[in-house]
Amino acid sequence: MSFKTIDDLRNSRNIMMEFLSQYRDLGELWFPNDVLVISILNRANSINEAFIELTTDSDDYNVAAFPLIRLQMDNLLYCYASTLVDDLMELMGCFVTGNNWNNFKDKDGNELKESYLIRKLCEKFGTTVFEKIYKRASDYIHLSTEYIGISLSKNGGEPVKTTIENYDASTYQQGLTDMMILINQALLNILATDYSCLRHESHKALQKLRLEHPTLSDMEILDRFGYSNNRFRAVFHKRLRSKE
């Protein structure tokens, strides 16, 4: 899968919508990893829509789009982190109660800190590009030299974009779009491979429980053995009530 333009970013958004439609077809028959995937897809899709809206006018590339690259990187890190753990149910419990994942450990006993996840992500895809994207995208969250470089100058009362780091504005803007595209590409890759395997394992577990408990419906099995999203709803609503 290769993305090059905003149109390709639109295509990735459409692929995410296809993923979401598959989950809608399942109704309430969700597994713990499904709850996380749906949350990530909804957030990623909204970020893509906002980024496209803010960057489609080549004459007025809105700098408000820049922090969205870091937010999408956040989606990628959360998605990938969840494929590295032994107990996804426990991680989901951490997720719905709003606790930080940093202290949660993966299968090898390493804490899920961002620096570690970036390194693992680079190993997975055989490139250091995500380390570079993460560092640069983080600069967009706060006022930094990135914003100073793209500040506007006035010429006869009309705003004029300055050149950036010896590149013209259009080249710089294309670089930003490329970063967002690469993040989307990696996210979709993980959803299509790692999460496909996770869902397969979940279905195998469900199949085993069906044989062991033939009198129970699928939803009763999922609720009883902690595979359904109802458990997470209960925890989440309890958390919301505690904040009132």
Set out the residue ranges of the language-model regions:
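A cross-kingdom marker of C-terminal helix-rich interaction/assembly modules
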Residues: 1-69, 74-244
